[in-house]
Curated annotation (Swiss-Prot):
The active site is at D221. It comes from Homo sapiens (Human). Residues 1290-1310, 1322-1351, 1905-2012 are annotated as: Disordered. The modification Phosphoserine is found at S433, S440, S480, S582, S1940, S1993. Residues 97-360 form the Protein kinase domain. Residues 1443-1563 form the PH domain. This is Citron Rho-interacting kinase.
């Protein structure tokens, strides 16, 4: 019941108080939409139009057949049918308007430019489809749009003229804005605008959005397409279909996504993704304004990316993804504006903040509508649409075929009641009432009087107004002149101010830039100084470290040197002691020589005495003997001393050897010291490298030059030092050579001394011999004395012997003399030897001194050399730093060189093959060259040998000369020694002679004894001498004792010396040990130093990284500082400008004050005048109020009079019509007799030209009516012809061919699709077969005139039977027969009950009415086309018959940006294997296409996709996505990228034709060799093949045992024995959709029956039934059905916490059941409502995962439902927002192996995400499907993905493994996943083609092996045309049938024409018998390799329909027996 409020009164009370007429008038006003006391926002929708809408709805609902059976309803309909028809005619309708063009097309509506036929006015009409609006009532808000347009008075919103509706559509007619939209304006300016233009349009957009907000609405879809430009250049905000009304808190609550993804605010996405309880306000519109501002300046959206999910992710993380490019330069105010809009909801600017923003400081917000716009569109006419992009007209606007009307009251039209609206309704009602009231005669006199008075007053006021207007014109003219001058001055002033401001801005920017540059310079200087300080400090540290290291090494070296020095000192002391001993020996030798001289002197004395004794005789001989004895003793002593001297010389040689060992140890120590110095030099080099590296960072070029100079200098120094080293080494070598020569000389001298010692010993021996002779002589003297004594006795004897004694004495004297001469000679020799010995000792001493000096000099030189080496190495190590940097660069170059070398090696391998022949000749030449080279080498070697021999000869000659010298010297000495020996021999001979003589004389002495006595006196004298000799002998003995004591002392010293030597040896050993320990310490210290160096390097790298980060921070801070300084400068400049303005304002204020004083006086005068006028105005207002009340009374009276007048008029019209009819009747009666009389018995013909005598008015009306009808008929006929021609032309243009006819290789489906478009037409409009295949030009010529059109050939074939669709839940993922997209499992689908074709519910209206069309009919119709074409003489082919031609208009993305900038209409031509794109249809002969696309690549692959995902084209209207097809090319090489081309077809038939034609061209690019190679490959097994009536519709499989597989079909449950090759039916169970075995209960869980009920079957009963299958009668199995779970489409079973659970999914809910062990049955525990049907279920250890619109997790403890994906993980934003882009869950797969952490793969329609058990991402990369998936299956480690005509296999690697997963693709016609196979890693697939069904076992590893052979990953999965895989099964059969000869007829050769020849020969196949117990011999295929090419969506029209069974009466070809081979290993 309606209640209308009038103030505070109750309507019932008011009705009781007011009269009925007043209430009727008020009710009339309410119906006119003008109820009193109601605002515009409170207006009720039930105006006159609303009540009419309600009346129309009531009438339509009552007209339903079900309600017409009610009597009262049928009476009501019959009663008011005419009235309703008349009212509907009076209502506005689409027929009142003529459509001129289409300017816009959206998701739910399209906008047309129309012209009102009656008035010619141009409007924009928005057409909306009611069904789409009702289906998306949460997205499209038509009521809000109508209310906003009708109630708005804002100039920023278009004015609504009319709103009306019909049965299928809603219409909004509003004012037309011909300037286009803002997107077109951006395209005009190349997507970027200046800031001045942006300022203007943003200001107007802000006012427009604010006007919507003031009305209480939020727009929610603000984008450039919804901002129009009117004819004056100002903007209008349109498209309020997404607007929402705000509540009292000014908030909006909505869950579904509203708006365009690129312009959505983050809070909208948050609410959309939440639980629906969140709200958002009008801030979302200001976010969209910010996005538009960003897009206007940068030419792109700030957050847009490839897919909507990524776009949503970027919007949610806008703080990270909002970036401002450097180009173009943008003012800081504008950047601040964008940042203030694209920010958080709380910080976002509102309307007040935007108005006060500095960017809009120059905007006059109150007069912006009157300001001139920057762009005014140029219009050619009122309906010009050139400023709009031409959109594509969608097929949904056209009227859909009639559907069956629902029975009963539906209520579908109730939401549209009150939609109608007419703008001029209220004004017209009032004016009509006034006019009708004025026609009434009531109160005419009073009105005339008042009219005269008012006319006079009006005349006076008009005169006054005329005078005032003249005065005003004069004043306006003067003011305009002044304003013109003023404006000119102001323009000049503004120009100067702007120039000044620009200059000031430039100055400020220059100042800031200078300051920033100065600061950066200072900073750079500081950095340079810091770097220098750091470098110096580092250099100092390195030097300090090197100094410390050098000190340590010097200390070690000094310690070693000190030890060596101590050893040297000790050795020198030993040498000194040895020298001292040698001096002692020499002194003793001198003493012995002196003693020898003394002895010689005494010997001479003795000789003198002997001479004296000769006279005396025997005394002298005795003395001589004593002397000889003494001489012998002296010789012995000399020999002992010589031995001691030899020992001393030996000790000296040992000391020399020890010294040499020490020198060698010293040299080794020096070498080790050099090694240490080299290492120190390396550390010094590291330090130098660091210093040089830091210098290179500062001064690159100077450092390079200095480094080069330094390198040259150091090289020179190095060469200089090396030369010095060489000189010093040479000098050392020379000194060592001198030393060696000296030592050799010393050794030679020692040898000479030894030889001389030998000579001395020989001489001593001679002295001994002489002593012995002396003793013998003394003995003789004694004897003589005795004889003299005897002679004294006898004088006779004395006398006789006197002479003899004298003779003997003389002889003795002679002998003494001889001996004295010999002793003198020996003494001379001894003196010579002593002199030589002294010379040798002196030379030895000098040589030793010289050696010491050389050693000291050598040490000094070595020290100096080491210092120079250290300095040189220090300088060299400084270069090594720079060299290491060069080496790093060299390593990079070497890496590049290595890459080039690898390429070079590859090239070399190729060259090696080409140079094989040349190498043979080269080898021969090489052999010849080698022979020559050998000869040359031999000659050269001989030359070298000769030179070496010459050198050796020279050396030998020198040595020989030296040896000769030595030999001469030695020989001379030997001659002297031999001379001495000869003398000794002569002396010995003389002694022997003397002995003989003595013997003779003794004989004489005996005779002269007497004479001896006389000599007694002489004897006494001799005795005295003997006494003297004895004393001398005692002295000699004493000396001998002294020599013995000295010998003992020397022995002691020798023992001490040996002890010292042993001690030195021990010290040497300890020294070696200490040296080894020192070496170990050195190695340890070296390792410590290296470790410290590594740590230092790591610290340096870390510090360098930190330094880089600090530098980046410093740079960012400096940039910010520069920006702030610029802002500061600008603010200062603004402050100065404001100060100047303030001063000017003050001056202006002063002038204004003065003017104010003047005006105040004038105001006082005017106030008085106004006061008088106010009094007059008050009186006039009073009179006006009086007139208003009188006017209202008159209106009421006029309305009453009008009602009465209408009644009277109706009565009068009825009377007049009755009287007219009576007159006509009477006139006809009067004329009738005359006609009869004239025509009776007369044979004349009637004259049709004679008019019938009727009244004139009636005839005129009748003639006018007939003319109008004829005109309408002509127009209707012309319109119909035009429509037919236009439709036929469009269809012909879409699929016409060129002048050639199609080749027989063209698929029959393409011709059948062309046939279908002709079959579904009516016969009178059906084109001929020739016209369908003829070129468009000939068809246009044929239909150019009506005569030619009527002469067309009308075929008798016609088929127009509509489908009987039933909308239900889809139980199997398949392909839509219309749009070629996926019909997903568990979603709503439309299925024809007759032909079983399936499509989307929205696509069912577009499917051609070809239900039940037999394939033979289409084939016959196609053959008729071919015959007509072949017989046509005008269709001669000019091109090769193998080419296929198709052309038509389609759309391609603008600028190849996936539709982000719209679509361009292009003319597409398929010519041969190329797709050519042109701008227009009329192509000239030489015109080149805009773009080309090659379908048959020589080194790549091309795939055709009949459907694409919505996320690929995020900015494309969702209504256009089903019409898009995609072509992809993938080259095999990585040098060229792939290519993608999207095409937008105008309709579904066009899309199907294009897809079929493109696929046929791509498929025709293969060659026979590739087919043969493909046929030879093997993969998997074909388990079963069913054909014709034996075909089963399989749904699922389950391995029941090792041999049996259960098969669920639409016909029931079957068991397949893979070993016995039999298929057995299990009775008692209906259609089976899913099977699962519960092993704990030994039950089979399945979905079965027509009701799709969940039921349990005992496993034992199934086994029993299989065991009894051979019996004629089997017991039926009765399943245990869950009555509460019916209509189930999916279930999952598992074990959670040791409890058996079932999760069953139904269309609107999910049911959870748990097994109760006490009751032994499953009980329902929870029912959960779902917004979308569940598509997947997975059991975990503690919960259940399900997929509906999102992935949810059900906790099995509390049975709570929550989202599975973690919202806090921003990387999962594409998956979280997937539902908003129509990408829903498909499957859940657990991919972790046993024992690993749980990991799941969540599969969506377009991608897959890896997550862990907590819903968080577990892997960084997602899986992308290469095409639209149907189903998923996982068999570890392979993921199987079924597509339309292919299977994709992906190897899921472990989580730790890196790299992309391996993929393989198999071409399988219509694959359907059945279930897992018996073997691991394999699945069962069902493949249906034509009337055959094949069950395939596909194994993952086989697929991988075959797939990876040519297809590595998605990018390499496409083979080249020369290496492409085998054809599909359909293509193979088609080509085999076409190429194979006709089979012989007869009973022995029954063959099916479509069976491949390869499967026929020698093979038998048994047909399946449906009777139980009869085994089925399944097909044993040879395991033909299924092609691994990419998918080619066939897009055929009959493919889906052919899957069902043929209708009754269709003829089937009998099966032939075929025997095939089958491998059981992989089942």
């Amino acid at each position: 019941m309606l209640k209308f409020k009038y103030g505070a009164r109750n309507p019932l009370d008011a009705g009781a108080a007011e009269p009925i007429a007043s209430r009727a008038s008020r009710l009339n006003l309410f119906f006119q939409g003008k109820p009193p006391f109601m605002t515009q926002q409170q207006m009720s929708p039930l105006s006159r139009e609303g009540i009419l809408d309600a009346l129309f709805v009531l009438f339509e609902e009552c007209s339903q057949p079900a309600l017409m059976k009610i009597k009262h309803v049928s009476n009501f309909v019959r009663k008011y049918s005419d009235t309703i028809a008349e009212l509907q005619e009076l209502q506005p309708s689409a027929k009142d308007f003529e459509v001129r063009s289409l300017v816009g097309c959206g998701h739910f509506a399209e906008v047309q430019v129309v012209r009102e036929k009656a008035t010619g006015d141009i409007y924009a009409m928005k057409v909306m489809k009611k069904k789409a609006l009702l289906a998306q009532e949460q997205v499209s808000f038509f009521e809000e749009e109508r209310n906003i347009l009708s109630r708005s008075t804002s100039p920023w919103i278009p004015q609504l003229q009319y709103a009306f509706q019909d049965k299928n559509h809603l219409y909004l007619v509003m004012e037309y804005q011909p300037g286009g939209d803002l997107l077109s304006l951006l395209n005009r300016y190349e997507d970027q605008l200046d800031e001045n233009l942006i300022q203007f349009y943003l200001a107007e957009l802000i006012l427009a959005v604010h006007s919507v907000h003031l009305m209480g609405y939020v727009h929610r879809d603000i984008k450039p397409e919804n901002i129009l430009v009117d004819r004056t250049g100002h903007i209008k905000l349109v498209d309020f279909g997404s607007a929402a009304k705000m509540n009292s808190n000014k908030m909006v609550n909505a869950k579904l996504p509203i708006g365009t993804p690129d312009y959505m605010a983050p809070e909208v996405l948050t609410v959309m993704n939440g639980d629906g309880k969140g709200t958002y306000g009008l801030d979302c519109d200001w976010w969209s304004v910010g996005v538009i501002a960003y897009e206007m300046i940068y030419g792109r959206s700030p957050f847009a990316e490839g897919t909507s999910a990524r776009t949503f992710n970027n919007i949610m993380n806008f703080q990270r993804f909002l970036k401002f490019p450097d180009d173009p330069k943008v003012s800081s105010d504008f950047l601040d504006l964008i940042q203030s809009l694209l920010c958080g909801q709380k910080e976002r600017l509102k309307f007040e903040g935007l108005c006060c923003h500095p960017f809009f400081s120059k905007i006059d917000w109150n007069n912006i509508r009157n300001s001139p716009p920057p762009f005014v569109p140029t219009l050619k006419s009122d309906d010009d649409t050139s400023n709009f992009d031409e959109p594509e007209k969608n097929s949904w606007v056209s009227s859909s075929p009639c559907q069956l009307s629902p029975s009963g009251f539906s209520g579908e039209e109730l939401p549209f009641v009150g939609f109608s609206y007419s703008k001029a309704l209220g004004i017209l009602g009032r004016s009509e009432s006034v006019v009708s009231g004025l026609d009434s005669p009531a109160k005419t006199s009073s009105m005339e009087k008042k009219l005269l008075i008012k006319s006079k007053e009006l005349q006076d006021s008009q005169d006054k107004c005329h005078k005032m207007e003249q005065e005003m014109t004069r004043l306006h003219r003067r003011v305009s002149e002044v304003e013109a001058v003023l404006s000119q001055k102001e323009v000049e002033l503004k120009a100067s101010e702007t120039q000044r401001s620009l200059l000031e801005q430039d100055l400020a920017t220059y100042i800031t830039e200078c300051s920033s540059l100065k600061r950066s310079l200072e900073q750079a200087r500081m950095e340079v100084s810091q770097e220098d300080d750091k470098a110096l400090q580092l250099l100092h540290d390195i030097r300090e470290q090197s100094r410390k290291l050098q000190e340590i090494k010097e200390q070690e070296y000094q310690a070693q040197v000190e030890e060596m020095r101590l050893m040297m000192n000790q050795l020198e002391e030993d040498l000194v002691s040895a020298r001292r001993r040698s001096d002692l020996y020499e002194s003793e030798l001198r003493e012995s020589r002196l003693a020898a001289e003394e002895f010689k002197r005494k010997a001479t004395e003795c000789q003198h005495k002997l001479l004296k004794a000769k006279d005396q005789g025997k005394p002298e001989v005795g003395e001589y003997a004593k002397l000889e004895k003494i001489n012998a003793e002296q010789q012995l002593k000399i020999q002992e001393l010589q031995e001691k001297l030899e020992k001393a010389v030996k000790a000296s040689t040992e000391a020399t050897e020890l010294l040499q060992n020490i020198r060698q140890a010293k040299e080794r120590a020096e070498r080790e010291l050099e090694k240490l110095q080299n290492r120190e030099d390396s550390s010094e080099g590291i330090r130098k490298k660091l210093v040089e590296a830091e210098e290179l960072e500062e001064k690159h070029r100077e450092a390079q030059v200095s480094a080069q100079h330094l390198e040259v200098h150091l090289k020179q120094k190095e060469q200089h030092y090396e030369e010095k080293i060489k000189v010093l080494d040479n000098q050392i070598k020379k000194d060592l050579a001198d030393k060696e020569t000296l030592e050799n000389m010393m050794q030679r001298h020692e040898e000479e001394a030894h030889e001389k010692g030998k000579i001395l010993s020989e001489q001593k021996a001679m002295i001994n011999a002489m002593d012995s002779k002396i003793r013998s002589l003394e003995q003789r003297i004694v004897e003589l004395s005795e004889a003299n004594k005897l002679a004294a006795n006898s004088s006779l004897f004395t006398q006789r012997n006197m002479k003899a004694q004298e003779e003997m004495i003389s002889e003795l004297r002679q002998q003494k003399f001889y001996l004295e001469t010999q002793a003198g000679k020996l003494e001379a020799q001894n003196r010579k030897l002593e002199e030589q010995l002294e010379k040798i000792s002196h030379q030895d001493h000098s040589d030793k001194n010289r050696l010491l000096e050389l050693e000291t000099r050598l040490r000094e030189v070595s020290l100096e050399h080491e210092e120079q080496k250290l300095e040189l190495k220090r300088q060299l190590t400084e270069l090594q730093l720079s060299l290491q940097e060069r080496e790093s660069q060299l390593t990079a170059l070497q890496a590049a060189r290595a890459a080039l070398e690898s390429q070079l090696r590859q090239a070399k391998t190729e060259l090696e093959e080409t140079t094989a022949e040349a190498e043979e000749e080269i080898q021969a030449l090489t052999a010849h060259r080698d022979e020559i080279q050998r000869k040359f080498d031999a000659l050269r070697n001989s030359c070298t040998v000769i030179t070496d021999l010459e050198e050796q000869l020279n050396q030998l000659t020198e040595d020989n000369a030296e040896l000769n010298n030595q030999n001469f010297y030695l020989s001379k000495q030997l001659d002297e020694a031999s001379g001495a020996n000869d003398e000794i021999v002569q002396l010995r001979s003389e002694v022997d002679h003397l002995r003989r003589e003595i013997t003779e004389r003794e004989m004489q002495l005996t005779s002269q004894k007497q004479t001896m006595e006389a000599l007694k006196t002489t004897c006494t004298m001799l005795e005295e001498q003997v006494m003297d000799l004895e004393a001398l002998n005692d002295e000699l003995l004493e000396k001998e004792r002294q020599w013995e004591a000295w010998r003992s002392v020397l022995g002691d010293e020798k023992s001490q010396f040996e002890c010292r030597v042993r001690e030195l040896q021990r010290m040497l050993d300890t020294e070696k040990q200490s040296r080894a320990r020192a070496d170990q310490r050195i190695t340890e210290s070296r390792q410590v130093v290296e470790l410290a160096v590594k740590e230092h390097k790591a610290e340096i790298l870390a510090l360098q990284q930190a330094l880089k980060e600090q530098k980046l921070k410093a740079e960012s801070l400096s940039d910010k500082l520069n920006d702030l300084e610029k802002k500061h400068a600008m603010l200062e400049m603004n402050a100065r400008s404001l100060q100047q303005k303030l001063e000017t304002e003050r001056e202006l204020k002063q002038r204004l004050l003065e003017e104010q004083a003047k005006l105040q006086q004038q105001m006082d005068l005017q106030k008085n005048h106004i006061f008088r006028l106010t009094q007059g105005l008050q009186e006039a207002l009073d009179r006006a109020d009086l007139l208003k009340t009188e006017r209202s009374d008159l209106e009421y009276q006029l309305e009453n009079i009008q009602v009465l007048y209408s009644h009277e008029k109706v009565k009068m019209e009825g009377t007049i019509s009755q009287q007219t009819k009576l007159i006509d009747f009477l006139q006809a009666k009067m004329d009738q007799p005359a006609k009869k009389k004239k025509g009776l018995f007369s044979r004349r013909k009637e004259d049709p030209a004679l008019p019938t005598q009727v009244p004139l008015q009636y005839n005129e009306l009748k003639l006018a009516l007939e003319k109008e009808k004829a005109r309408c008929a002509e127009l209707e006929e012309a319109l119909q012809k035009t429509r037919i021609e236009l439709r036929s032309a469009r269809e012909e243009a879409a699929h016409r061919k060129a002048t050639d006819h199609p080749h027989p290789s063209t698929p029959a489906t393409a011709r059948q699709q062309i046939a279908m478009s002709a079959i579904v037409r009516s016969p009178e409009h059906q084109p001929s077969a020739m016209s369908l295949l003829a070129p468009p030009s000939s068809r246009r010529k044929e239909s150019s005139t009506p005569e030619e059109f009527s002469r067309r050939l009308k075929e008798r074939m016609h088929h127009n039977i509509p489908h009987r669709f039933n909308v239900g839940l889809n139980m199997r993922a398949t392909k839509c027969a219309v749009c070629l997209d996926t019909v997903h499992f568990g979603r709503q689908a439309s299925k024809c009950l007759e032909c079983q074709v399936m499509c989307h519910p929205k696509c069912s209206t577009c499917l051609p009415a070809t239900c039940g069309l037999p394939a033979e009919y289409a084939t016959h119709f196609t053959e008729a086309f071919c015959r007509d074409k072949m017989n046509s003489p005008g269709l001669q082919t000019k091109e090769p018959s193998s080419s296929l031609h198709l052309e038509g208009w389609m759309k391609v993305p603008r600028n190849n940006k996936r539709g982000q900038q719209g679509w361009d209409r292009k003319y597409i031509v398929l010519e041969g294997s190329k797709v050519l794109i042109y701008d227009n249809e009329a192509r000239e002969a030489g015109q080149r296409p805009v773009e080309e696309f090659e379908l048959c690549l020589p080194d790549g692959d091309v795939s055709i996709h009949g459907a694409v995902g919505a996320s690929e084209l995020a900015n494309t209207a969702k209504a256009d996505v089903p019409y898009i097809l995609k072509m992809e090319s993938h080259p095999h090489t990585t040098c060229w990228p792939g290519r993608t081309l999207y095409l937008l077809a105008p309709s579904f038939p066009d899309k199907q034709r294009w897809v079929t034609a493109l696929e046929s061209v791509v498929a025709g690019g293969r060659v026979s060799r590739e087919k043969a190679e493909a046929d030879a490959k093997l993969l998997g097994n074909s388990l079963l093949k069913l054909e014709g009536d034996d075909r089963l519709d399989m749904n699922c499989t389950l391995p029941f045992s090792d041999q049996v597989v259960l098969v669920g079909t639409e016909e029931g449950l079957y068991a397949l024995n893979v070993l016995k090759n039999s298929l057995t039916h299990v009775p008692g169970i209906g259609a089976v959709f899913q099977i699962y075995i519960i092993k704990d209960l030994e039950k089979l869980l399945m979905i079965a029956g027509e009701e799709r009920a969940l039921c349990l079957v005992d496993v034992k009963k199934v086994k029993q039934s299989l065991a009894q299958s051979h019996l004629p009668a089997q017991p039926d199995i009765s399943p245990n059905i869950f009555e509460a779970v019916k209509g189930c489409h999916l279930f999952g079973a598992g074990k959670i916490e040791n409890g058996l659970c079932i999760c069953a999914a139904m269309p609107s809910k999910v049911v959870i059941l748990r097994y109760n062990e006490n009751l032994s049955k499953y009980c329902i525990r929870k029912e959960i409502e779902t917004s979308e049907p569940c598509s997947c279920i997975h059991f975990t250890n503690y919960s259940i995962l399900i997929g509906t619109n999102k992935f949810y997790e059900i906790d099995m403890k509390q049975y709570t439902l929550e989202e599975f994906l973690d919202k806090n993980d921003h990387s999962l934003a594409p998956a979280v927002f997937a539902a908003s882009s129509n990408s829903f869950p498909v499957s859940i797969v657990q991919v972790n192996s046993a024992g690993q952490r749980e990991e799941y793969l969540l599969c969506f329609h377009e991608f897959g995400v890896f997550v862990d058990s907590y819903g968080r991402r577990s892997r960084t990369d997602d899986l992308k499907w290469s095409r639209l998936p149907l189903a998923f299956a996982y068999r570890e480690p392979y993921l199987f993905v079924t597509h339309f005509n292919s299977l994709e296999v992906i190897e899921i690697q472990a989580r730790s493994s890196a790299g992309t997963p391996a993929r393989a693709y198999l071409d399988i016609p219509n694959p359907r996943y059945l279930g897992p196979a018996i073997s691991s890693g394999a699945i069962y697939l069902a493949s249906s083609y034509q009337d055959k069904l094949r069950v395939i076992c596909c194994k993952g590893n086989l697929v991988k092996e075959s797939g990876t052979e040519h297809h590595r990953g998605p990018s390499t999965s496409r083979s080249s045309p020369n290496k492409r895989g085998p054809p599909t099964y359909n293509e193979h059969i088609t080509k085999r049938v076409a190429s194979s000869p006709a089979p012989p007829e007869g009973p022995s050769h029954p063959r099916e024409p479509s069976t491949p020849h390869r499967y026929r020969e020698g093979r038998t196949e048994l047909r399946r018998d449906k009777s139980p117990g009869r085994p089925l011999e399944r097909e044993k295929s040879p395991g033909r390799m299924l092609s691994t090419r990419r998918e080619r969506s066939p897009g055929r029209l009959f493919e889906d329909s052919s899957r069902g069974r043929l209708p009754a009466g269709a003829v089937r070809t009998p099966l032939s027996q075929v025997n095939k081979v089958w491998d059981q290993s992989s089942v």
